[in-house]
Amino acid sequence: CAKTFIPNHPKTKLLVEDINKVKAKQVPFIDILAGGFPCQPFSVAGHRKGFEDDRGGLFFQIIRLIEELEQDKRKPKVIFLENVKNMYTHDNGKTYLKMKSELEQKGYHIVKKILNTCEYGNIPQNRERLYIIGFLDENVKNRFKWPEKIKLTNTIENVINWSGEGIDKKYFYNESSKCWDLLNEAMTQKHSIYQFRRVYVRENKSGVCPTLTANMGMGGHNVPLIRDDN
């Protein structure tokens, strides 16, 4: 995460630290506290243990920071949180309501919405996420408007490095790879996305990549595959 963030935000001070150990005094003056926490405890792809998972409990570290900043008279005016859409319905909605209640107890007025990257970011990937925003000032909350959808103009065709140059060879299948014969036979079209579904290969004809997840780096089924120019 840090390796990606730093080149894109070279002027931003990045504190790489265990959130459990970060104290308010390490945080500069801020108007907006943007927080994310591991989605696996709430995700369909995970075991959905929610707050019973240590990673799910990291939400309460955000609450702790808010409390410490408030004690220092630097309480953020806005709280901005993001997670998988399934968090909204996790445990019959109790997880979301618990988080909403915790934020409201800190004085925040809450709005929430599920947005898809391909409809708002002009990125050809289906990535639905739940966004939760809390405002200290209720008047600001009432004036807030979610962004309008934008037309998707970027396509898989123009965002993927089809040459394969500069990409680690470990991400490529070859004749010695397991399931090579099946993949080679099924993946006939270049510049298209395929998914290996354990026993068959499906071509994704929507032109939009399915959600990329953290565990895809470990291989397995459902990982998007392409046939590059080589």
Predicted feature descriptions by range:
Residues V16, A34, F80-L81:
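Generic enzyme active-site microenvironment
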Residues G217-G219:
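Short, charged/polar surface micro-motifs in flexible loops or helix N-caps
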Residues P38:
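Short glycine-/small-residue-rich Rossmann-like dinucleotide-binding loops
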Residues K13-L15, R74-K75, H221:
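Secondary-structure boundary/capping residues
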Residues N222-N230:
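Short, surface-exposed loop/helix-turn segments at secondary-structure junctions
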Residues C1-K21:
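SAM cofactor-binding core of SAM-dependent methyltransferases
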Residues C1-N8, W146, S176, T188, ...:
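Short intrinsically disordered, low-complexity coil segments enriched in acidic
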Residues V22-I30, F42-T211, N215:
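Class I S-adenosyl-L-methionine
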